[in-house]
From Swiss-Prot:
The active site is at H117 (pros-phosphohistidine intermediate). Homotetramer. Belongs to the NDK family. This is Nucleoside diphosphate kinase. Its EC number is 2.7.4.6. GO terms for molecular function: ATP binding; metal ion binding; nucleoside diphosphate kinase activity. One of its GO terms (cellular component) is cytoplasm. SMART domains: NDK (SM00562). Its main location: cytoplasm. ATP binds at K11, F59, R87, T93, R104, N114. InterPro entries: NDK-like_dom (IPR034907), NDK-like_dom_sf (IPR036850), Nucleoside_diP_kinase (IPR001564), Nucleoside_diP_kinase_AS (IPR023005). It comes from Synechococcus sp. (strain CC9311).
Length: 152
């Protein structure tokens, strides 16, 4: 059985504030495996597809403007329960409601600048990974310390 994968993106505010290493480190220390990584400034088309579920919401235009305003670090992380675990690590969408110890709880204040995005379900992860990455951009590899990360 293939391990679960999740799409995680460090938004322009996180990149501009120099938080990439801090965030990557949290996922690595948790024991998840990085299988895709790139930095890009998203096109408007990509942003509109990514946030398509919010198209009719009043904040849609501002959200698209923000995510296309600078570089984003797009990642695919793999591991048992990575989607649920990543959401817990990220914290509540509204940073002031996020628990201390979460990425947003520690590193963000405002909902419009909440540093990071993470897939919320397997179907969403599959869609987002396919939107942001070509299959050839994902690495299938085994960390040398794999037996120390997970059983079996």
């Amino acid at each position: 059985m293939a391990a679960e994968r999740s799409f995680i993106a460090i938004k322009p505010d996180g990149v501009q504030r120099g938080l990439v290493g801090e965030i990557l480190g949290r996922f690595e220390r948790k024991g998840f495996k990085l299988v895709g990584l790139k930095q890009l400034t998203p096109s408007r088309e990509l942003a509109e597809q990514h946030y398509g579920v919010h198209k009719e919401r009043p904040f849609f235009g501002g959200l698209v403007d923000f995510i296309t305003s600078g570089p984003v670090v797009a990642m695919v992380w793999e591991g048992d329960g990575v989607i649920t675990s990543a959401r817990k690590m990220i914290g509540a969408t509204k940073p002031l409601e996020a628990e201390p110890g979460t990425i947003r709880g520690d590193l963000a204040i405002n909902i419009g600048r909440n540093v990071i995005h993470g897939s919320d379900a397997p179907e969403t992860a599959e869609f987002e990974i396919g939107l942001w990455f070509n299959p050839s951009e994902l690495s299938d590899w085994t960390p040398s310390d794999q037996t120390w990360r997970v059983e079996g």
